């Protein structure tokens, strides 16, 4: 996939120029999906990259959003300030995105995420801490919800069925962050428009941080196979990343086992700080 991208760039200097703009911009503008509240993702038909759209100017972003809207794709734009860029780029890794289509004026280039911002393998840098990420699941959910919510009462197509199967396969292999209150009893619950109650869980620390801005909750890590054991009685299932892709999944409840192992807490701030330090260090070496 990386070789294919390099072949499209006849001038070897160009990717560096575009990557430099990504690093040094005071602000950038991202196209957001109206279906997921996250960056709009698409699969490039030529390179098969899973990419997002970034613009260096607001007018260009508005024009790009208008083109998508004309295709009945609900989108908006979001300004990303310089101080938030590193965390924004780090979040692309957790989303499963591997490339950015960068628009500078009338020019555009597909830039691989690893060409301008790199990080070490979390498995090599967690220092005994529990590191939670589910990029394949997160990406598949984004594609699924972008399509499913595109039109009201849309029928389930064969393509959506395939994505559902992929989501199920990825989900059962993962481990997730479950929020518990710092003080007192009770587990946070989310009430959907249907009136059904779901327990929020998160694919990664960045999604948990969005939910826990007031720091009322502490995170614990639970494997997918054990989620049914910790599901509150009143909850119909779980909802993944409620402030983002917001995907509910019904979970078949099982009798809680008192001998179940204690869930280990994960340090959210430490993991985000570590990810940012690694990104800064790698960018400084280039």
PLM features: residue spans?
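An interfacial alpha-helical scaffold signature
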Residues: 1-286
């Amino acid at each position: 996939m990386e070789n294919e991208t390099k072949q499209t760039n006849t001038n070897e200097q160009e990717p560096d120029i575009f990557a430099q703009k990504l690093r040094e911009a005071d602000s950038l503008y991202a196209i957001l999906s109206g279906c997921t509240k996250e960056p709009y993702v698409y699969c490039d038909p030529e390179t098969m990259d899973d990419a997002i759209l970034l613009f260096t100017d607001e007018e260009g972003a508005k024009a790009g959003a208008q083109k998508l809207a004309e295709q009945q794709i609900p989108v908006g734009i979001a300004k990303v300030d310089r101080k938030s860029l590193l965390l924004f780029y780090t979040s692309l890794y957790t989303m499963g995105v591997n490339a950015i289509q960068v628009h500078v004026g009338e020019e555009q280039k597909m830039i691989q995420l690893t060409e301008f911002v790199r990080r070490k393998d979390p498995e090599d840098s967690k220092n005994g801490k529990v590191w939670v990420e589910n990029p394949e699941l997160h990406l598949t959910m984004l594609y699924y919800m972008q399509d499913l919510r595109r039109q009201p009462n849309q029928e389930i197509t064969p393509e959506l069925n395939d994505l559902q199967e992929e989501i199920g396969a990825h989900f059962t292999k993962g481990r997730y962050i479950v929020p518990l209150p710092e003080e007192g009893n009770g587990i946070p619950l989310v009430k959907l428009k249907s009136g059904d109650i779901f327990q929020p869980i998160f694919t990664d620390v960045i999604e948990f941080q969005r939910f826990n801005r007031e720091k009322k909750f502490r995170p614990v890590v639970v494997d997918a196979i054990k989620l049914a054991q910790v599901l509150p009685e009143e909850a119909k299932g779980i909802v993944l990343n409620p402030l983002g892709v917001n995907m509910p999944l019904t979970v078949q409840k099982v009798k809680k086992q008192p001998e179940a192992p204690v869930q280990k807490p994960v340090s959210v701030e430490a993991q985000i700080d570590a990810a940012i330090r690694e990104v800064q260090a790698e960018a400084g070496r280039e």
